[in-house]
Amino acid sequence: MPSDDFVKTARKALISHSVSIQNYTEDDCQIAFHATTNSFMQTIRLVHIFFCTFGAISSSLFIYVLLNSSSRNLHRNLRISLASLAFAALIACLQLDFIAFYHLALTLTADNACDSMYEARKCAILRFPVVLSIYATLCGIIVLAIERTIATLKYKTYEANGSRVVGLVLVTGQWFVCIIVAVFSVLLRSDPGYVHYCTAYVSHPRTSVFSLCFMSALEVATLVYFVLLLQSNQRRQVNEFVNKAMHSLSERYQLQENVRIMKILIPSITVHAILGFIGLGSMLAFAIIYRYADERLIVGFAPFSEVVLLVIPIYAVVFPIVAVVQNKQLRLASRRALPFLFNPESPETSEMLPADPPPLHKIITSRPSRQLEKESNTHFDLLNEMWKK
């Protein structure tokens, strides 16, 4: 496609008006009724209910683990950022669950085919939490990139000087920006009138394609940036081990923490990017098949839209699993906060359990590894004080 044609297509997509119609006929009612009640859409709704329910449970448990005292060994900004991402997924799962149940109940109780028509503005309000969650996830990933950049550049003083304030300010900014963008997006595309099916984007699918392309490109760029940050921290970590006398214990701890956090974030964001590309592929398929569709044929976009939205609950299920599996500290915190989900006899779990009380009579035993670690930390603290002098 020539560059001029591509620019014209992009401009047309970005300024596409809502596909709502001002007046509907009996034929419109029948089209909407068929789109709502056909067996394929009913199956998609049941799949939505299944994944959204498990996604909401998974996100809730993950947030509980991050806020529980068992995860206090994790970096506070990591907990804040991960909890923010999980909260965004939780909002979307709850709203998608509600929408699926609502549509299912409406299908079973509808007496008139015209009851399947939706007011465009009510549809926009109904789908607003989902749109908010999509932007909150993207903004959250960008916020993580900013926070990790600060931690990398200021690793010598980051742990001691205001890191909690940095995390809270960034997360507050994340939600402020995503709320403004989501409200603007909904207001821009919620024209008066009626739609045949209530999708997340009440507009032509071309708009969704270009929006998803932009978000996917931004996410891939952020992922590449995370990989570069990981390599930078690993190089500094190697230099720290070679020249230990030139680095304090706080600096060494922060470098190790940076590497551990990046190894959590990269797999999690990779999963989200892969799922996003799957959704983008579905949108592109529809845009190619229905390139010149008018408002009344856009209802065929509904199945593609619902399949794409499955990305959100699937990510809500996969994201906590990947984060827990990739990080031992987070895994141990999960075992302690949610013992009913894990094997209490696991060797990892035993590391988090309190030590047994000493016996009444003296016996010769080796000291617990945790005691040795405590004494080792005390020893290094003393050495650090000597180095400072």
Swiss-Prot record:
GO terms for molecular function: G protein-coupled receptor activity. One of its GO terms (cellular component) is membrane. Disulfide bonds join 123-198. It is a multi-pass membrane protein. It comes from the Eukaryota. InterPro entries: 7TM_GPCR_serpentine_rcpt_Srab (IPR019408), GPCR_Rhodpsn_7TM (IPR017452), Nematode_rcpt-like_srab (IPR053286). Residues 67-81, 145-167, 230-268, 325-389 are cytoplasmic. It is found in: Membrane. Gene3D superfamilies: Rhodopsin 7-helix transmembrane proteins. Residues 1-45, 103-123, 189-208, 290-303 are extracellular. Its main location: membrane. The chain crosses the membrane at residues 46-66, 82-102, 124-144, 168-188, 209-229, 269-289, 304-324. Keywords: Disulfide bond, G-protein coupled receptor, Glycoprotein, Membrane, Receptor, Transducer, Transmembrane, Transmembrane helix. Glycans are attached at residue 23. Belongs to the nematode receptor-like protein srab family. This is Serpentine receptor class alpha/beta-14.
